[in-house]
Amino acid sequence: MTYYKLKIFLLIFAFSNLLACSANKSYELKGNTFGTIYYIFIEDDKSLNSNEIHSNIKYILNIIDNSASNYKNNSEISVLNKFKPDAFKTISSNLFNIINKAKIVGDMTNGYFDITLGDIKISKGFYLNKKGSKRNGRRNYTYKDIILSDKNLIKKTFPNMNIDLSGIAKGYAVDLIFNYLMSKNISNFVINIGGEIKTFSKNKDFINLAIDDPTNNQQYIEEVSLNNNSIATSGTYIDTVDFEGLEISHITNPKTQQNVSNLNLLVSVIHDECAI
């Protein structure tokens, strides 16, 4: 089987089943978002207005970026992180949904997925646009201390809590784009935002992927086939900084409150929802 390598978080694509339908028309949409790149492959037996589709996709991406980006000082999540009063605050439905899903994933992983680790990452030198001081001692809050209420209301029970959505925002955007493309009755497509991937095939064809070895990007360690579902991949080698002479990963263990220093780890999760 032939695999075509696409340099996005070291994932390898094979569109062998889709491309076999030579009578179909194919479209490639790509660009930059969330500090990474996105790539969308579409195939259909009818002509599509790819410019209109791409424009609507960019609109979706822009909405989520402005809501959930920790890199933008004026994004909705950045404004929320600066909000100190011990009171509820109204947020957009998208931000509410992202945080709600993050809390669900936190419960599913026994607390190992925790969106309140932003202050630790900032103190170690991640997010260069943010200023943070070196932390002393352990902090005593988790994602469970974020309270969500009706009508898109949120309350941080610890005002200095810094919510980091980088582990879920891309997947949430992938799911929104998936729903949009489904509404257009498109036959086959693959969505990839920085390694967060979701596929659809009207004929339920499998789309084959291979995942690179984090220790040697000339080799791959696993082959997977997707059939109308998602895969999200992250690794300790992807985003690192030098902290006090030690190279550390952006991935933080919420139990120890320490960044992972083993830079050869990678995990992929397959699920119906890319945000999960």
Per-range role (PLM):
Residues 2-9, 19-276:
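Mature catalytic core of soluble alpha/beta enzymes
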